[in-house]
């Protein structure tokens, strides 16, 4: 699910930058009015401080309230996600809450596309991603996620030509973003997987495996990043019709999954089992 703290940050970035200058303007107008209405300096100072304080409180409270409202709205979708996982029901609920009404944050649109992609609704994912008209104007995290989802969607649908275009134009940004956030290895893993999907769609299976074998080591036996690498290896061997290595890749993924001792949600084990099966059939 989309990070609540990051969504809160986006609300503050969007509305505080609008409301704070208005607050300053109101304070200035209030000072001028008080200056002409009240000649007493003490009264003038008190009223000016009150107006300034209220203006600042409003400029902070409004984005905070909107972020809280966003969180409340998302409870229904999160409850479906918590109990059922990535399902059409969850994706539709998320879309209804965040996308179909009002002016959604681009990050909500991108994440909704990602969720549809996880249930192989790639046409819907493409429609949603096409709503983002100018990704270079997004904040860096949203922009990074947008390119990952575009690459992933193009790779899974075989549209390597469009994927290579996205890759060529934005690989510098993607690599720089990963370097700046090297304390978050999940970003590097997801980037390498997305790029590997483009290579595999183009038939460059060796390049795809070079990306998957970029040196990431599992941090423990419950490492979902490493499991995703193994599942995508199954998928790429299936596309390459390399049956011997496919059998080994399936065993590797199933064995690593069996060693898991903890999942974030009860449905995760079954979800990953199904992903391994689908990947072995050349589907993701």
Model-derived segments and spans:
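Transmembrane-cytosolic junction motif
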Residues: 6-8, 38, 57-86
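Alpha-helical adaptor scaffolds
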Residues: 148-222
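Helix-turn-helix repeat elements of alpha-solenoid scaffolds
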Residues: 77-93, 117-130, 159-173, 200-213, ...
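Juxtamembrane interface helix immediately N-terminal to a transmembrane segment
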Residues: 2-24
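Flexible helix-coil transition and linker loops at the boundaries of alpha-helical arrays
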Residues: 94-102, 133-143, 173-185, 218-224
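Hydrophobic alpha-helical transmembrane segments
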Residues: 32, 39-57
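Long, non-transmembrane cytosolic or organellar matrix-exposed soluble domains/tails
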Residues: 204-284
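"A position-specific structural signal for the A-helix of alpha-solenoid helical repeats
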Residues: 75-76, 107-115, 142-153, 187-201, ...
């Amino acid at each position: 699910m989309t990070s609540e703290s990051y969504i809160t940050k986006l609300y503050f970035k969007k509305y505080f930058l609008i409301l704070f200058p208005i607050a300053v303007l109101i304070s200035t107008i209030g000072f001028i009015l008080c200056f002409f209405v009240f000649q007493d300096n003490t009264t003038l100072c008190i009223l000016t401080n009150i107006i300034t304080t209220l203006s600042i409180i409003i400029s902070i409270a409004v984005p905070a309230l909107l972020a809280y409202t966003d969180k409340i709205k998302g409870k229904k979708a999160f409850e479906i996600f918590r109990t059922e996982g990535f399902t059409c029901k969850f994706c539709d609920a998320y879309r209804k809450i965040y996308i179909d009404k009002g002016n959604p944050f681009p990050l909500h649109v991108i994440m909704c596309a990602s969720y549809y992609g996880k249930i192989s609704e790639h046409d819907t994912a493409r429609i949603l991603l096409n709503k983002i008209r100018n990704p270079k104007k997004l904040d860096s995290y949203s922009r990074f996620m947008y390119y990952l989802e575009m690459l992933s969607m193009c790779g899974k649908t075989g549209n390597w030509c469009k994927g290579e275009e996205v890759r060529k134009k934005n690989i510098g940004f993607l690599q720089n973003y990963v370097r700046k956030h090297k304390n978050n290895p999940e970003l590097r893993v997801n980037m390498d997987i997305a790029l590997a999907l483009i290579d595999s769609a183009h038939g460059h299976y060796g390049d795809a495996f070079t990306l998957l074998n970029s040196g990431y080591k599992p941090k423990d036996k419950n490492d979902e990043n490493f499991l995703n690498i193994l599942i995508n290896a199954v998928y790429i061997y299936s596309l390459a019709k390399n049956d011997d290595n496919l059998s080994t890749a399936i065993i590797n993924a199933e064995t690593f999954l069996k060693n898991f001792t903890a999942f974030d949600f009860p449905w995760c084990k079954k979800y990953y089992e199904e992903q391994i099966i689908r990947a072995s059939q050349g589907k993701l």
